[in-house]
Design a protein with these regions (language model features):
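A cross-kingdom feature that marks ATP-driven nucleic-acid transaction machinery
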Residues: 1-108
């Protein structure tokens, strides 16, 4: 199997990679039977609010959490969510950066 490098396919545009990852997560949540919407509270947007059988899951998707600004943005999206449903940040980072009750998971 030949190696394909992300930059060769997408160029240096990380936003495109984020969109591909968001699409993968969206399709997977639909496959699992969730109703999937985009959340918005104030000026912050949550990538996906997934609901099934009265349960809810909040998801943020990022390629990498490489800078403090990215970490603040992705985890900060949940700042105004006041319920206790699970909140996840998904990325390709291989080490756990969970914080403040928000779980970080590797997207693979």
């Amino acid at each position: 199997m030949p190696k394909i490098f992300i930059e060769a396919v997408f160029g240096g545009n990380m936003r495109d990679i984020n969109l591909v990852l968001e699409n993968i997560v969206y399709m997977e949540m639909l496959r699992r039977g969730y109703d999937v919407t985009v959340g918005k509270i104030g000026d912050k947007e949550i990538d996906f609010v997934c609901e099934k059988a009265g349960e809810k899951i909040y998801l943020q998707v990022a390629y990498l959490l490489a800078t403090e600004d990215t970490i603040k943005r992705e985890f900060g999206a949940f700042d105004n969510v006041k319920d206790n449903y699970p909140k996840y940040v998904l990325s390709l980072d291989e080490f756990d950066m969970s914080r403040n009750g928000i779980k970080h998971l590797n997207i693979r």
